[in-house]
From Swiss-Prot:
Keywords: Calvin cycle, Carbon dioxide fixation, Chloroplast, Photorespiration, Photosynthesis, Plastid, Transit peptide. InterPro entries: RuBisCO_ssu, RuBisCO_ssu_dom, RuBisCO_ssu_N, RuBisCO_ssu_sf. One of its GO terms (cellular component) is chloroplast. One of its GO terms (molecular function) is ribulose-bisphosphate carboxylase activity. Belongs to the RuBisCO small chain family. RuBisCO catalyzes two reactions: the carboxylation of D-ribulose 1,5-bisphosphate, the primary event in carbon dioxide fixation, as well as the oxidative fragmentation of the pentose substrate. Both reactions occur simultaneously and in competition at the same active site. Although the small subunit is not catalytic it is essential for maximal activity. This is Ribulose bisphosphate carboxylase small subunit, chloroplastic 1. Its main location: plastid. NADPH and 6-phosphogluconate function as positive effectors to promote enzyme activation. The basic functional RuBisCO is composed of a large chain homodimer in a 'head-to-tail' conformation. In form I RuBisCO this homodimer is arranged in a barrel-like tetramer with the small subunits forming a tetrameric 'cap' on each end of the 'barrel'. Residues 1-46, 1-47 form a transit peptide. It comes from Oryza sativa subsp. japonica.
């Protein structure tokens, strides 16, 4: 284009003057004999915890909580139903992802559990889901049972949590 057609709107920007002074900030001062100075997270120790790397398996969405009571399960199922999701129960002897047949992920590596009966289309009562959970626990007492919430409009699973852990399982909590 011709130079006369283009309108130039140059703006001036102040040159970079460096970072703001940190003199007013509460920072530990470094000592001259150490490259790290007096670095300390002592003030934060009360609020930080480290997850143990052995002995506690993480299973599903709510696995960081203590085992769910019947009342807790009812509340979760009622939330699932209020959200217009279809409840479904699944079970598995191994409650976590594993690879047995191949190094790469595949269909039979523990991500897919066996469905207990059919999805509970039309279910409106949380106690119906709990009755199915009790039946699944009686039929497979040594299996993990989880409840999932399926959105049949978007065709996706939106919630999943362990509802029963078999006795003797790490962190089973007697649920």
């Amino acid at each position: 284009m011709a130079p006369s057609v283009m309108a130039s709107s140059a703006t001036t920007v102040a040159p970079f003057q460096g970072l703001k002074s940190t003199a007013g900030m509460p920072v530990a001062r470094r000592s001259g004999n150490s490259s790290f100075g007096n670095v300390s997270n002592g003030g934060r120790i009360r609020c930080m915890q480290v997850w143990p790397i052995e002995g506690i398996k993480k299973f599903e969405t709510l696995s960081y909580l203590p085992p769910l009571t019947v009342e807790d399960l009812l509340k979760q199922i009622e939330y699932l139903l209020r959200s217009k999701w279809v409840p479904c129960l699944e079970f598995s002897k191994v409650g976590f992802v594993y690879r047995e047949n191949h190094r790469s992920p595949g269909y039979y590596d523990g991500r897919y559990w066996t469905m207990w009966k059919l999805p509970m289309f039309g279910c409106t009562d949380a106690t119906q889901v709990l009755k199915e959970l009790e039946e699944a626990k009686k039929a497979y007492p040594d299996a993990f049972v989880r409840i999932i919430g399926f959105d049949n409009v978007r065709q996706v699973q939106l919630i999943s949590f362990i509802a029963y852990k078999p006795p003797g399982c790490e962190e089973s909590g007697g649920n």
